[in-house]
From Swiss-Prot:
Upper classification of the organism: Bacteria, Pseudomonadati, Pseudomonadota, Gammaproteobacteria, Enterobacterales
Gene for this chain: aspS
PROSITE patterns with a match to the protein in the record: AA_TRNA_LIGASE_II
Keywords (A to Z) from UniProt: Aminoacyl-tRNA synthetase, ATP-binding, Cytoplasm, Ligase, Nucleotide-binding, Protein biosynthesis
EC number: 6.1.1.12
The protein's name: Aspartate--tRNA ligase
Source organism: Salmonella paratyphi B (strain ATCC BAA-1250 / SPB7)
Length: 590
């Protein structure tokens, strides 16, 4: 039906007869001439109808936005004065000789000339996807997956599929369950990741595996989360953690070079402890120049319990955050930031405004100045590198609250004061995470997952001091987003059972849930390690949007619903009966 795409026509096509298929993007009727912008997935081209082709001109008068049409015509060069530098096809136009209206369009529920609500865009997603910016994002996504496949093939990885209907395992979020008709009362789980299957593939001898795979997690959603998402899943045997990172870093550098024309260079490597200490986050945005600076040793003897208490507590921390040019902040802005950090558990926000550093106490403005000596103030200013016109904010509490509160404040100030370089790419690896974290109920939970190996510890050493264990894990972070994470896996049965025991999984439960894994570990398991990238998040970064729904063709809302198909929906009673399922309605409170 077509010979060319609208958006691919150039001066090299001048004089050629072409047939185009697409949609009317815009129509301008000048009486004796009618111009339309015709659009397909590759872009837009100007088509015009003149009186010499009367039938086509007459039919063109009926055209409206989003009519689906076919046009045959001749490509012509535009006069110099009519060249449109804003269009890729702006040097040419098509003189139409024939027009076919394939399908007409009703009045549109989306307005191309105004900003539509996200609710409307999701309800009429098939129309929203016609917009050039949306089409470009999905084309970029397709390019990314193509580049990934070629790279992985070139590096000896095998694309192997793993099951969608599997067994529920504890991986940190709720599973989506699928009832079995054949085995009434039993359920499959949709995979949160192919974690155990890819480890079993390593045990099967497939030493380099990858898969671009759908995963499912029934969790509370955020702007960068979806209940179903796509992973670039990777596993290797006989490779160390640095070797895995080297290959995966090469993949991401390849993507940025091919898609953005940007060489990311070598990725710096930072420990979890350093990232938390300097940036208050395990996924630091290095485009932001501000850092947290420890000042507890300077404040242990001050007559101000808010500072002195945490400064003398081994579990406490007092940190300072220097804000370049922050002295300009108004009292209301400071109060707003004080309320902001309370979201993260902080009780408030002490500060020092540096007006003229050379004047000592007389050169600062601070509600806590009366508790500080000139020497202490000078030491704080020296350590933070404060200059005239800067602001210093303080966090004083337990270590987690200080990191969370000042880390979040750092990001907010970076954005509010334009301190974060939005034109920069800042990738890094974060390594050496704690193996476990407090579950809030007196027990421990795995910081990554229960199959991550500890660094340099035997099973008996791990059992004795699990709180001290460091995971042989690594996350790739770009511009403050965790785009991928992985680890060296446990390949020893004793170690795996030790980890399960620390997590409170008794031997009977281990056999019920992981018996197949424990059995497989008995038969010559190779050392193995892997990583998974979030394809949706990578695409989000590479297309410059901050909403993950913009890079998924048919995404869910933050309530995990599809507004277009109205999923989820109630099931047919006959189907439920066949599955042996009875829906119990909650009693309404009177």
């Amino acid at each position: 039906m077509r010979t060319e795409y609208c958006g691919q026509l150039r001066l090299s096509h001048v004089g050629q007869q072409v047939t185009l298929c697409g949609w009317v993007n815009r129509r301008r009727d000048l009486g004796s001439l009618i111009f339309i912008d015709m659009r397909d997935r590759e872009g837009i081209v100007q088509v015009f109808f003149d009186p010499d082709r009367a039938d086509a001109l007459k039919l063109a008068s009926e055209l409206r936005n989003e009519f689906c049409i076919q046009v045959t015509g001749t490509v012509r060069a535009r006069d110099a004065k009519n060249v449109n530098a804003d269009m890729a096809t702006g040097e040419i136009e098509v003189l139409a000789s024939s027009l076919t209206i394939i399908n007409r369009a009703d009045s549109l529920p989306l307005d191309a000339n105004h900003v539509n609500t996200e609710e409307a865009r999701l309800k009429y997603r098939y129309l929203d996807l016609r917009r050039p910016e949306m089409a470009q994002r999905l084309k970029t996504r397709a390019k990314i997956t193509s580049l990934v496949r070629r790279f992985m093939d070139d590096h000896g990885f095998l694309d192997i599929e793993t099951p969608m209907l599997t067994k529920a395992t504890p991986e940190g979020a709720r599973d989506y369950l699928v009832p079995s008709r054949v085995h009434k009362g039993k359920f499959y789980a949709l995979p949160q990741s192919p974690q155990l299957f890819k480890q079993l593939l390593m045990m099967s001898g497939f030493d380099r595996y990858y898969q671009i795979v759908k995963c499912f997690r029934d969790e509370d959603l955020r702007a960068d989360r979806q209940p179903e998402f796509t992973q670039i899943d990777v596993e290797t045997s006989f490779m160390t953690a640095p070797q895995v990172r080297e290959v995966m870093e090469a993949l991401v550098r390849h993507l940025w070079l091919e898609v953005k024309g940007v060489d990311l260079g070598d990725f710096p490597v930072m420990t979890f402890a350093e990232a938390e200490r300097r940036y208050g986050s395990d996924k630091p945005d290095l485009r932001n120049p501000m850092e947290l600076v420890d000042v507890a040793d300077l404040l242990k003897s001050v007559e101000f319990a808010v500072f002195a208490g945490p400064a003398n507590d081994p579990k406490g921390r007092v940190a300072a955050l220097r804000v370049p040019g922050g002295a300009q902040l108004s009292r209301k802005q400071i109060d707003d930031y004080g309320n902001f950090v309370k979201i993260y558990g902080a009780k408030g926000l002490a500060y020092i405004k540096v007006n003229e550093r050379a004047k000592g106490l007389d050169g600062i403005n601070s509600p806590v100045a009366k508790f500080l000596t000139a020497d202490i103030v000078e030491a704080i200013l020296e350590r933070t590198g404060a200059q005239d016109g800067d602001m210093i904010f303080f966090g004083a509490d337990n270590k987690k609250v200080v990191a969370d509160a000042l880390g979040a404040l750092r990001l907010k100030l970076g954005k509010d004061l334009s301190l974060t370089d939005e034109d920069k790419w800042a990738p890094l690896w974060v390594i050496d995470f704690p193996m476990f974290e407090d579950d809030g109920e007196g027990g421990l939970t795995a910081m990554h997952h229960p199959f991550t190996a500890p660094r340099d510890m035997t099973a008996s050493e791990l059992k004795t001091a699990p709180e001290e264990a460091v995971a042989n894990a690594y996350d790739m972070v770009i511009n403050g987003y965790e785009v991928g994470g992985g680890s060296v896996r446990i390949h020893n049965g004793e170690m795996q059972q030790t980890v399960f025991g620390i997590l409170g999984i008794n031997e009977q439960e281990q056999r019920e849930k992981f018996g197949f894994l424990l059995d497989a570990l008995k038969y010559g398991t190779p050392p193995h390690a892997g990583l998974a990238f979030g394809l949706d998040r990578l695409t989000m970064l590479l297309t410059g949007t901050d909403n993950i729904r913009d890079v998924i063709a048919f995404p869910k809302t933050t309530a995990a619903a599809c507004l277009m198909t109205e999923a989820p929906s109630f099931a047919n009673q006959a189907a439920l009966t066949e599955l042996g399922i009875q829906v119990v309605k909650k009693a309404e409170n009177n």
